[in-house]
Amino acid sequence: MDLRRRMELLADAALADREGVAQLRRPSPVGKHPLASVGIAAVRLPGGGCTNLMRVMQTNACSLSCGYCPTFRGGNVPRVSISPDETARTFMDVHRKGLASGLFLTSGVPGRAARATDRMLATLDLLRRREGFTGYVHIKLLPGAEPAQVEEAARLANRISVNLEAPSDVYVQRLAHDKNFSGDLLPKLEQAGRLLAVRRGVPGARPASGATTQFVVGPAGEHDREILTVVDRLERRRLLHHAHFSAFQPVVGTPLENHPATPAARELRLYQAEHLLRQYGFTLDELAFGLDGNLDLERDPKTAWARAQPAFFPLEVTRVPYEALLRVPGVGPATARTLVESRRTTTLRGREDLRAAGVDVVRAAYYLTLHGRRLAAAAPAEQLRLFAPGSHLTQAPYRTPVPPCAYR
């Protein structure tokens, strides 16, 4: 099989992994360029805008038996691989043509994880030393990678991710009995987070973007509170930059093909809650979990908190501090900063001034006063749903080797 076809297969296999603030739900802007098929994906940047990454697996051969993954050892997919030299040369060709600014590299685990990890590290070494590439590289470390390999990855890459898959040993075993949460995945993620944190403090060192992880949500039976407890603990210790969540979708031919899909709304609520913990100053105990330990699918967690705090609201928008503004539904960090800065030099006169500052006035008005006058007499009405939140017209398993869920 020629390199082009192998690259296409391995690029498809890598696209399910999450990167950036949120995966863009649109085709890459490279369009019909001859090199577009090698896995160019558009991702959002934290400060707005987007960039293009080349995303590829070095091999989709795998000896693991993850129940959600089409490339598990019993999966009926063509097994291909590309060498470190082929990966590095293809990426540099794409990069020089202006199609990708960075590389996202992962791999299956055919046999010993250390050997597959060595091939990935060899690719990064070729990029840095032979090709002189100084841009963004994200490497996804494999289960079973050795501590010395984590150190080398932290030297060569800007970002390292280790997929925890689930929040404890019990749940990981239900998904992938070859993986070890407490003895391998979690310590490896913590080591990567520490190494990248140290590098961020070294003058002149390669920019470090922190460590990330990902959870397959639903099929193991875990609760949202359990997932967010792990995420919150790691983020508060500065060992995790952010987490990704992937609502499980069954794939034909995998051990979990008959397991029901996880509602997309649950994935969304986890992302919203993680942002509240990481960027809005919320604590885990402030999030509104149901008796089942899960977030409300009908109402976003910030609104759920606000509705339960009548004594906290309304807030006078011309006086309250930044931290209090962050608690208002419809006000994010950038908008809160804009409000605090603008009221030093101008007078906020009405809804239009708030809207110009970025406030979602429909959501925020009930929780705010402006010069002592409440902007809305009642909270916005919530629209009734025809279907259950996050449900789909069909729950049939995907018949594609590339599901919209994390499998590496």
Regions found by a protein language model. Give the residues of each.
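Catalytic cores of alpha/beta
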Residues: A145-L156, A220-R236
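Flexible, acidic/Gly-rich N-terminal and inter-domain linker regions that tether
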Residues: M1-L64, D360-V361, L368, R373-R408
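Residue-level signature of tetratricopeptide-repeat
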Residues: S342-R343
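Core AdoMet radical
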Residues: F72-T87, V94-M120, L126-Q149, A154-P203, ...
